[in-house]
Amino acid sequence: MAATGEALTPQGYIQHHLTNLHVGEGFWTWHIDSLFFSVGLGVLFLWLFRSVGKKATTGVPGKLQCFIEMIVEFVDGSVKETFHGRNPVIAPLALTIFVWVFMMNFMDMIPVDWLPWAAGLAGITHLKVVPTTDLNITFSLALGVFVLIIYYSIKVKGVSGFVKELTLQPFNHKAMIPVNLLLESVTLIAKPISLALRLFGNLYAGELIFILIALMYGANLALSALGVTLQLGWLIFHILVITLQAFIFMMLTIVYLSMAHEDH
């Protein structure tokens, strides 16, 4: 149903759920819902982990403290196994990426009509609640990682070392500089693009499947019953998807930053 109460066609229903609440036009379009949920979940993550950290005890920990300690130890172990340099920033960065991306992905577990319906009561016509189904968000995350790759590459290797890496690899000959530069530039640029598109594609597809299943509820009793079964099955499978995508984004970030710290 639209916020105005008008019945939507299946095509209109899908389009309605895939349209962001936005202001502005063209390049200067701001997706208000994506910004709200991504920033809000980021603040929630910081508050939650800071609160648990301040209340942490050496005695018998509570369930929440145990859960968060388990996440921290898991991420710390992943960093130690993958990152071969020395940088105290990498582990906190990896933890932030993993938990933040997971929380944004987890919004996909909320039934597709609940929050848009509630927003419609307040006069908000469109609301996308999963930030990682917005290409602007995934590219922003990937761009942040890309900036860190360039920064640490120059910091560790120096400007001359970074330039040599781009121009003298894989073929160590001056005559091959144009070829090397082309190959290395494509490889470098492909890193943030693949990070962004992989996360976006998987979550967008998952959201679209939830929307298609939700359409079945408005058909007939048999399709509604089938929709319940399909939604439950996809919900269980999607828990694995959203966790795996957060893990992959984190691990690739660690790998790329580890490569940036390798001084050839």
From Swiss-Prot:
It comes from Shewanella loihica (strain ATCC BAA-1088 / PV-4). PANTHER family: ATP SYNTHASE SUBUNIT A, CHLOROPLASTIC. The gene is atpB. Belongs to the ATPase A chain family. This is ATP synthase subunit a. Gene3D superfamilies: ATP synthase, F0 complex, subunit A. It is a multi-pass membrane protein. One of its GO terms (molecular function) is proton-transporting ATP synthase activity, rotational mechanism. F-type ATPases have 2 components, CF(1) - the catalytic core - and CF(0) - the membrane proton channel. CF(1) has five subunits: alpha(3), beta(3), gamma(1), delta(1), epsilon(1). CF(0) has three main subunits: a(1), b(2) and c(9-12). The alpha and beta chains form an alternating ring which encloses part of the gamma chain. CF(1) is attached to CF(0) by a central stalk formed by the gamma and epsilon chains, while a peripheral stalk is formed by the delta and b chains.
